[in-house]
Design a protein with these regions (language model features):
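Alpha-helical segments in soluble extracytoplasmic regions
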Residues: 54-140, 150-185
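Short, functional N-terminal and low-complexity linear motifs
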Residues: 3-6, 38, 132
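Terminal targeting segments of Actinobacterial cell-envelope proteins
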Residues: 1-19
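Ser/Thr/Pro/Gly-rich low-complexity linker/stalk segments immediately outside membranes or between
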Residues: 38-57
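Hydrophobic membrane-insertion alpha-helices, especially the h-region
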Residues: 21-39
């Protein structure tokens, strides 16, 4: 039996191995610290969550009523089956559905939340909703001209504004206040 051959490393190789081990060890410790912070110490509260639960309950109730009004307007006919005035009729339905949103947003905005965070971010949410409402009105006007294009909405930092609106609504448990999907079908 022959003894194992020992390989002598140069000082440069030893230093290189030591540095590599140090860098890998530091990365492992850093990742471990990040996950411990994320699961143990980081805030679990959403950045959109406001403290005034009475305000959110009131907003949810208003949005729920508006949603019921929109559901009563549903027209499941195909555009091709609706006749020569199909686009004009669809535009009128969109206007009525948008009116329910507009009325709900105006009613919600009549009373401000009582907490500081709510006072700061709810007006931004209302402004975003008003932008979406204007997008819907512009789309209805486009349909009246005979152009049957897909609905497109304003973008905010690369995302549709509806994503921002619906995220705020979901984070505050106001599911009826999410953007309706009636124009995205």
């Amino acid at each position: 039996m022959t003894p194992p051959v020992s390989i002598k490393r140069t000082t440069g190789q030893n230093i290189s191995r030591l540095i590599s081990r140090f860098v890998i060890g530091t990365c492992i410790v850093g990742l471990l610290a990040m996950w411990i912070y994320a699961f143990g110490f980081a805030s679990k509260e959403s950045v959109n969550k406001i403290g005034d639960q009475k305000w959110t309950a009131r907003a949810e109730e208003i949005c729920s009523k508006a949603e019921e009004q929109r559901l009563a307007l549903v027209d499941l006919r195909q555009i091709s089956d609706a006749g020569v005035n199909a686009l004009t009729e669809r535009a009128a339905l969109i206007d009525k559905a948008t009116d329910t949103l507009d009325n709900a947003v105006n009613e919600i905005s009549a009373i401000s939340p009582t907490d500081e965070k709510g006072k700061a971010i709810v007006p931004l949410w209302i402004a975003d909703y008003k932008t979406l409402i204007q997008d819907r009105r512009d789309y209805a006007n486009q349909l009246r001209t005979g152009v049957n294009a897909s609905f497109s909405e304003s973008m905010f930092e690369g995302l549709p504004i509806s994503e921002k609106i619906s995220t705020f609504a979901a984070d505050n448990r106001m599911t009826s206040c999410k953007v309706p999907i009636d124009l995205s079908i």
